[in-house]
Amino acid sequence: MKKILLSLVVFYQRFISPLTPPTCRFYPTCSQYTREAIEYHGALKGLYLGVRRILKCHPLHKGGFDPVPLKKDKNSKTTHHH
């Protein structure tokens, strides 16, 4: 599932995104964010985070820097995302 989702995002980045004007209001872009979220958090949570991000990407949202959230360990402390 993870590989399929990542393949779809990469396909979009390579073949569809270059045909459209840049409109993403965030850094990293929504497609890159989704790709990183899937790689880091796995298919389900990564897809959820990606869809949630895409829904925020509209003219009424200011956008800006919005990295993939870090995982939390069992003690609720964040771990580092590299």
UniProtKB/Swiss-Prot annotation:
Pfam families for the chain: YidD
Query: Could you list the residue ranges forming a coiled coil in this record?
Result: none
Q: Which InterPro entries match?
A: Membr_insert_effic_factor_YidD
- Name where it's found: Cell membrane
Q: What UniProt keywords are attached to this protein's entry?
A: Cell membrane, Membrane
The record, for NCBIfam families, names: membrane protein insertion efficiency factor YidD
Membrane topology, as annotated, equals: Peripheral membrane protein
- The name on file for this protein is Putative membrane protein insertion efficiency factor
What segment(s) does the record annotate as region Disordered?
63-82
Purpose of the protein:
Could be involved in insertion of integral membrane proteins into the membrane.
Query: What broad class describes the main subcellular location of this protein?
Result: membrane
Q: Which GO terms describe its cellular component?
A: plasma membrane
Species annotation: Staphylococcus epidermidis (strain ATCC 35984 / DSM 28319 / BCRC 17069 / CCUG 31568 / BM 3577 / RP62A)
Family as reported in the entry's similarity comment: Belongs to the UPF0161 family.
